[in-house]
């Protein structure tokens, strides 16, 4: 395993310091804060919703040294160097987006993760196969190391990742290099969650199930608990769609689960066909395959979700699939907006926040205590307006649905430092 990134090293060190503090360690950054100690940042008066603690109510959050040090009903403003007024706002753990494209300058569709924060409230993003074995090191060294947003990744089974887009990366199956992919996952196990493969007909041509088989083999050969992330939508045949679902293991991720995209012949071969849920989809869900939204610019269809959700295939995670093309699309797949669409489909606020914090954080399972506001967790916080009233949403096939609630980003704090005011002085961030 390669060395931890500086960001994750510091997060890991904080958790160790917390444990050491209970044994009387001297100088622990996470030692219990005293009544005369000051916080670097106080987020005051917000409506805190933290599914990891089954917490909902007005709370103040005190952050010091980049770590949540207090979560109380009332913390005097005088105890903080800076105060962020969250009165009347929804305050949650920083959002965790399991499907993004955040490899600018390397992938053909990547956006700088830090540019997304104002629109997404994302403190943690997962690169969904932007890089493969040949360019993952560049993503790690030159992008992730310079980014305030916490980044993880799925390594693409194609050795060049999404660099050739819009040219398909797996028309030539020889680009799916199992050993090289396995090595990349193993050597970056602190950052690489697993392997990504896109199984649409316009990506794999006539290669059938073989790309997925190679990707699963790369996971297994890595010697790590690597997961698959499998992109569907426009699969060549209905039979192949069922084969894909049957091959997925518990804990593997089916992304674009509610896609309504047609294949190259115009046929609809997704998890809902002719208005009915595929039996293989329900079987996959029941054995523990993770259903991820991955809205994107062409991969979310209300009519699919409206059959799948009551049929037993609710999402486990809500993600954006944000990239340079989807970000300009009418569906506006910024994460809070996608969460709002699922409230329009009948999910509760608590459910959609769980699907964008606690659950994806557990899937990542790397840095301690992300996706939570527990004491000792990194100071990652999302602050949003909850706008109540009629709102209209559009999917990626121009279907419209009306909702009654919209989440709008207000402010985001990463490792205890806001993106914007109030600025930390000196501006030293991890």
Per-region residue spans from a language model:
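N-terminal secretory signal peptides and thylakoid transit peptides that target proteins
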Residues: 1-17
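Histidine-rich, glycine-flanked metal-binding segment
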Residues: 22, 26-42, 47-92
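C-terminal cap of metal-dependent C-N hydrolases
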Residues: 46, 378-429
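Metal-associated gating/positioning segment near the N- to mid-region
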Residues: 77-78, 85-146
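Active-site beta-loop-alpha junctions enriched in small/polar residues
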Residues: 101-103, 130-131, 156-160, 197-202, ...
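Metal-cofactor-binding active-site regions of metalloenzymes
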Residues: 120-126, 130-131, 146-173, 196-203
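Histidine/acidic residue-rich metal-binding segments in metalloenzymes
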Residues: 176-291, 299-316
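His/Asp/Glu-enriched, well-ordered alpha-helical/loop segment
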Residues: 303-386
């Amino acid at each position: 395993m390669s060395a931890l990134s500086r960001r994750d090293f510091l997060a890991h060190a904080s958790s160790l310091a917390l444990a050491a503090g209970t044994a009387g360690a001297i100088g622990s950054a996470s030692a219990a804060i005293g009544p005369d100690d000051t916080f670097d940042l106080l987020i005051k008066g917000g409506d805190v919703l933290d599914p990891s603690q089954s917490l909902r109510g007005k709370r103040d959050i005190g952050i010091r040294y980049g770590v949540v040090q207090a979560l109380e009903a009332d913390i005097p403003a005088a105890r903080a160097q800076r105060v962020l007024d969250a009165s009347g706002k929804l305050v949650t753990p920083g959002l965790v987006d399991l499907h993004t494209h955040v490899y600018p300058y390397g992938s053909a569709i990547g956006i700088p993760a830090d540019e997304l924060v104002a629109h997404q409230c994302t403190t943690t993003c997962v690169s969904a196969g932007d890089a493969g074995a040949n360019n993952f090191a560049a993503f790690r060294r030159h992008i992730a190391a310079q980014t305030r947003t916490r980044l993880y990744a799925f390594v693409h089974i194609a050795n060049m990742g999404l660099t050739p887009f819009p040219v398909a990366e797996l028309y030539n199956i020889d680009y799916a290099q199992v050993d090289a992919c396995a090595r990349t996952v193993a050597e970056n196990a602190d950052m690489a969650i697993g392997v990504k493969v896109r199984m649409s007909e316009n990506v794999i041509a006539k290669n059938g199930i073989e790309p997925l088989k190679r990707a699963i083999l790369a996971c297994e050969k890595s010697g790590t608990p690597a997961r698959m992330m499998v992109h569907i939508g426009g699969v060549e045949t209905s039979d192949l769609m069922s084969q894909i679902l049957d091959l997925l293991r518990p804990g593997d991720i089916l992304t674009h689960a509610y896609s309504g995209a047609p294949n190259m012949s115009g046929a609809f071969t997704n998890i809902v066909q002719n208005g009915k849920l595929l039996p293989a989809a329900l079987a996959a869900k029941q054995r523990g395959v993770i259903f991820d939204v991955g809205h994107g610019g062409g991969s979310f269809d209300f009519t699919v979700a409206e059959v799948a959700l009551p049929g037993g295939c609710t999402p486990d995670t809500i993600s954006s699939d944000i990239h340079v093309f989807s970000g300009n699309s009418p569906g506006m797949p910024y994460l809070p907006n996608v969460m709002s669409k699922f409230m329009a489909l009948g999910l509760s606020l608590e459910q959609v926040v769980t699907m964008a914090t606690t659950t994806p954080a557990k899937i990542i399972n790397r840095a301690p205590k992300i996706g939570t506001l527990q004491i000792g967790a990194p100071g990652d916080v999302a602050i949003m307006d909850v706008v109540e009233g009629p709102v209209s949403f559009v999917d990626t096939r121009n279907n419209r649905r009306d909702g009654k609630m919209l989440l709008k980003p207000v402010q985001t704090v990463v490792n205890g430092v806001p993106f914007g005011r109030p600025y930390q002085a000196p501006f030293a961030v991890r």
